[in-house]
Amino acid sequence: MNYFVNRLLYLLVVFVIAISGVFVLVNNMPGDPAYGLAVYIAQQRNMQFEQALEIAHKMMGIDPHESVVTRYVKFMNNLLRGNFGYSTFYNTSVNEIIARALPWTLFVISLATFISFSIGIYLGAFAAQKRGKTIDTLISTLASIIQAIPPFILAVLILFVFSVRFRLLPLGGAYPVDMEPSLSISFIGKVLLHAVGPILAVAIPQMASWTLSMRGNTAQVMEEDFIRFAEMRGLADSVIASKYIRNNAMLPLVASLAIGIGYMLGGQTLVESIFNYPGIGFYFGKAIAVRDFGLLTGLFSLIVIGVIVATFVADFVYALIDPRVKLK
Amino acid sequence: MRKESLKNFYYDYIQPLLVNKKSLIGLIILTFFILMATVGPLIVPLDMTSNFAERYQKPSLKHPFGTDYFGVDIFQQIVHGSRSVISLTMLASFFAVLIGTVIGVARGYLEGIVGRAIDAIIMVFLVIPSFPALLILAAVFMNYNLNVVEIALLVAVWLWAPLAKQISAQVLSLKSKEFVEASKMLNMPLRYILFSDIAKLLIPYIFINFVMQIKGAMEFSVGLMFLGLAKFDPTHWGIMLNYALYQAGALYTAKGFHYIFFIILNIVLLIYGGILLSQGVEEVFNPRLRGNE
Amino acid sequence: MSIIIRVEDLRAVYLVREGTIKAADGISLDILENSVTAIVGESASGKSTIIEAMTKTLPPNGRILSGRVLYKGKDLLTMREEELRKIRWKEIALVPQAAQQSLNPTMKVIEHFKDTVEAHGVRWSHSELIEKASEKLRMVRLNPEAVLNSYPLQLSGGMKQRVLIALALLLDPVVLILDEPTSALDVLTQAHIIQLLKELKKMLKITLIFVTHDIAVAAELADKVAVIYGGNLVEYNSTFQIFKNPLHPYTRGLINSIMAVNADMSKVKPIPGDPPSLLNPPSGCRFHPRCEYAMEICKKEKPKWIRLDGEAHVACHLYEEGRPLK
């Protein structure tokens, strides 16, 4: 238990450092914190820089006479109360945007993770059992080719092939603009159809990496002495394959599963942007594009919280399922 | 003497890579792109003037990869863009390895509070989701018109941490090994121990990691360019992709397929070359690394 | 006593990149029922290969080239896999050398007992299983309540070795084969295990075969000793006779080397030279390069496996020529 308390404290420190880092980065740029935004506004609206700077100050809620320290204390204080800040671009609180976007992101990543993990584990174990045979070479080569495709590039390909060329999938969004959200079957069907693109773009690269890790782990476990001893005891191959090989090979992967979900919260910025899928990543991309630093810091805080919670959960899960860790 | 050590270097590090199938193919792919970046622009001229009469031409002898929305030859752009793609990727990998090695070795050697502080820094960079953080950093610096070296540094900041962690662990374990103990007992200076004993064992490690960084560096830099966050070269493939999708709308017209396809093909092939080489390097050198543990 | 296992001209090799390792080269051996047989040899002399080939549990790169292993008149080597699986563990149990890594780290000890029983179609209720497992664990001097619900990493090296023995005894096998039961253990634990095997031998009607590099262990436990050198069986005799009157020059060297440990250091007579490479073994008698009695014929011809008076068997030209060691 002591271990977990330590770990939690440690992750909290990491959180504070990370968030403070971003705050300092955004707010304490050489010169004026609103400089970047002001340049952007001046370009966009074709106005004088001084005028733009004034607008930028207002938009960011900065009083130029207030010290950075005061602002930092305010910001952290708000964060502690669960207030993620204010978006100047959307003219609403970041909390409201999170409430709107988070369900979509969670929906996509949980489905994508579930699909990629189950298929990847199966394929990896299968390839390892057939090590050196053609089917193994095929699976591993395909998997490493897929790994060479960044998810957002895959998203572009999927969008082009399935949406533009063959018109099988919608061009973007989470559901048709002309539909009112409801619990009707047709609406749910549309929601699923809109999610296919983002899910594929996230799941396929994931699947490749699960496959490769599972293949490596399985091959390693197959060399272990306890496998030979199980064979000597006359256990059936199916029992050895599941209880001895698969269970041991899978353990480390189950833990990374939790961490993976945490990282995907913010890691799918480009994929969601390409599909115009209104999740956290989409708003993050938008915040970058329009230099909405309030929204940016708020969403980033959420992403870091997600990663930290996931890391903690992963530790916990690992300790729960692996006696080697549990007993230490 | 020099000749002898060069020969040894060839047999120890180069020849095994030419024998391994994966690293050989990876090397061929990377060499192809490096040639494209160095010699290519000298042979292939770049003409960026718009010629709407030739918009979206299919690949032909005249235009091997076809033309884009503005009627500009895509092949020429790819060749000229490879220069900034390769230099950005290599520089970013180099910086990442440099930062990771320096911090990792420092962590391995420094004990007490300083060591723990470095640990915490490494941990922070390990935990923070790197791509969103990179985007924020890039957005903050966007209006400063960064050059290749500066962008490479921005990317490298988010790549070095895993390497630093591995190296610090290696140094810590090497530190306790007998021969380091021995050089301490023989009263040799710390500097000597550091460079002679440890550096020797870390070289293959650093080499492997440089190659392994290529994938991350490529993905990050192309992603940055794709979002239009660093625009120093209009023919960088990430920026080409950005133009193709958002300026020219090539994504939404079936005629533009070859435009997107050839950009993507080159990006993926280059990353795949890096992956193959790193898999090969790992296969060749890792047993040796494990032997050192 | 009757013969329970008869090994005839067993040949097994390992395929490695550099060639084939001729690890067991024409082994013939009779194992007597309810006896304890020690197979003694230096490391990499092929002694483990013999028992692994006998039970068809060689690692993937191992191949059996020829020979027969007759158990109750049936050849284990040509038996169908299904039939062999039934005999394995139920009648012939093998405790491997790597005792420390032989249990599944993610399974409790009890589950190992459970799946072993299930694999052999034995229908025991859970309480029966616990009862039987506890009985065997007590037999190896372990506390069943504590051990059964432990994970392997909670056990010490000696405890793991005992769990493997208990596991091997679970289905009351006729033959128990142990590969280096005392290696990788500290001296005290080694003594415990030897003591334990002695007790088992008294307690149970069982045939024990064990492999060891330590001839002292053989002296303490075995009724009969088989000496292996470079993949060949060189001598086979009752323990008493082997120590009293070693026939083969190699056996004599082995025994001299242990006598020296607790005797006068000046009389230490280690065998000069190195163990042979099994990739390219020496011609003729594989011991000839290290043998002080080597003759011309030893370099050319492989000595025959001959039976002398009593139980004594030896492979040495000295005896074929009728010039025994004095």
UniProtKB/Swiss-Prot annotation, chain C:
ATP binds at residues 44-49, 61, 97. Gene3D superfamilies: P-loop containing nucleotide triphosphate hydrolases (3.40.50.300). The C-terminal iron-sulfur cluster may stabilize the structure of the C-terminal loops and may function in the regulation of the transport process. One of its GO terms (cellular component) is plasma membrane. Its EC number is 7.4.2.9. Residues 5-255 form the ABC transporter domain. Keywords: 4Fe-4S, ATP-binding, Cell membrane, Iron, Iron-sulfur, Membrane, Metal-binding, Nucleotide-binding, Peptide transport, Protein transport, Translocase, Transport. [4Fe-4S] cluster binds at residues 285, 291, 298, 316. One of its GO terms (molecular function) is ATP hydrolysis activity. GO terms for biological process: peptide transport; protein transport. InterPro entries: AAA+_ATPase (IPR003593), ABC_transporter-like_ATP-bd (IPR003439), ABC_transporter-like_CS (IPR017871), Oligopep_ABC_C (IPR013563), P-loop_NTPase (IPR027417). It is a peripheral membrane protein. It comes from the Bacteria. It catalyses: a dipeptide(out) + ATP + H2O = a dipeptide(in) + ADP + phosphate + H(+). CDD domains: ABC_NikE_OppD_transporters. Pfam families: ABC_tran (PF00005), oligo_HPY (PF08352). SMART domains: AAA (SM00382). It is found in: Cell membrane. NCBIfam families: oligo_HPY (TIGR01727). Part of the ABC transporter Dpp involved in dipeptide transport. Responsible for energy coupling to the transport system. Contains an N-terminal conserved nucleotide-binding domain and a C-terminal domain bound with a [4Fe-4S] cluster. The C-terminal domain forms a stable loop region and interacts with the N-terminal domain. Belongs to the ABC transporter superfamily. This is Dipeptide transport ATP-binding protein DppD. It comes from Caldanaerobacter subterraneus subsp. tengcongensis (strain DSM 15242 / JCM 11007 / NBRC 100824 / MB4). The lineage of its organism: Bacteria, Bacillati, Bacillota, Clostridia, Thermoanaerobacterales. The gene is dppD.
